[in-house]
């Protein structure tokens, strides 16, 4: 991970070194906490030094929430600006699109909660059909698509999220693809506690949701989808992160890490 901190000067905020790791998510949570009660303000945010392109998804969700009551201006260092123009994120903030000739971006998208078919087509065409992914059978690809679609459906089924945000990036030097799916709903903790009549903390709720057979939908099998996804990622030396409320979960090389955001 990198060093993440905010430079505060009035309503102008600079965010440095945002990786897609615990520290990076903590920095975005801190940004949200700073402004969540702001109303009718002009807020300028500067992205500096480094910004993982797939973090456009959580940042986009935060900026949309802040933008309902404030005027948001987003700026970025030139190297960051270029990639975020290529993936389409900055098109939502007044910047022209830039052609991605290297085909390393997976477009930033904002799906309405009823756009299941469009989301499935996007994941299939933009993510699962990428040549950098490992070879797998059509049936395996279909199962992975179903698992990712289930994440979308669960977010819209359980929460009042208005949009689902997605974005990804291929890194040729590391030979890896980072992909993020974000919603702005009530979170896993509230969903699980409502289902069980419990008072679990966010990390405990995430743990519960990861167990085979556990589901928050009546009469619907659950848990299996995330298990299948984790097995696929482990086999291909990938990792899975889940961030919900103040809980953080990461499974990398079958090593499971739980942490709590401040």
Each predicted region: which residue ranges?
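Helix-loop-beta hinge of the Bergerat
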Residues: 106-136, 189, 196-212, 231
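Glycine-rich G1-box
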Residues: 186
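Acidic ATP/Mg2+-coordinating residue in the GHKL
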Residues: 183
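Conserved ATP-binding N-box helix of the HATPase_c
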Residues: 60-65, 136-173, 226-233
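A glycine-rich helix N-cap at a beta->alpha junction
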Residues: 86-106
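Flexible ATP-lid and adjacent glycine-rich G1/G2 motifs of the Bergerat
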Residues: 193-250
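Amphipathic alpha-helical interaction surfaces in cytosolic regulatory modules
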Residues: 17-93
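Conserved short strand/loop->alpha-helix "switch" segment adjacent to the catalytic nucleotide/phosphoryl-transfer site
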Residues: 50-53, 125-149
């Amino acid at each position: 991970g990198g060093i993440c901190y905010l430079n505060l000067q009035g309503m102008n905020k600079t965010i440095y070194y945002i990786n897609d790791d615990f520290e990076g998510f903590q920095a975005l949570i801190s940004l949200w906490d700073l402004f969540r009660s702001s109303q009718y303000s002009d807020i300028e945010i500067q992205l500096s030094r480094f910004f993982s392109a797939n973090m456009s998804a959580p940042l986009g969700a935060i900026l949309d929430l802040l933008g309902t009551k404030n005027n948001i201006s987003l700026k970025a260092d030139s190297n960051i600006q270029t990639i975020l123009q290529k993936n389409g994120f900055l098109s939502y903030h007044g910047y022209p699109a830039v052609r991605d000739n290297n085909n390393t971006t997976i477009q930033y998208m904002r799906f309405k909660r009823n756009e299941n078919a469009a989301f499935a087509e996007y994941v299939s065409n933009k993510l699962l059909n990428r040549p950098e992914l490992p070879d797998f059978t059509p049936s395996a690809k279909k199962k992975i698509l179903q698992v990712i679609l289930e994440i979308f459906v669960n977010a819209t089924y359980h929460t009042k999220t208005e949009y689902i945000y997605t974005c990804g990036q291929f890194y040729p030097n590391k030979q890896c693809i980072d992909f993020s799916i974000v919603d702005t709903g009530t979170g896993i903790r509230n969903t699980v506690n409502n289902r069980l009549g419990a008072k679990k903390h966010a990390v405990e709720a995430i743990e519960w949701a990861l167990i085979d057979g556990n589901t928050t939908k009546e009469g619907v099998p659950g848990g299996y989808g995330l298990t299948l996804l984790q097995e696929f990622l482990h086999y291909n030396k990938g990792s899975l992160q889940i961030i919900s409320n103040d809980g953080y979960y990461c499974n990398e090389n079958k090593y499971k890490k739980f942490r709590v955001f401040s």
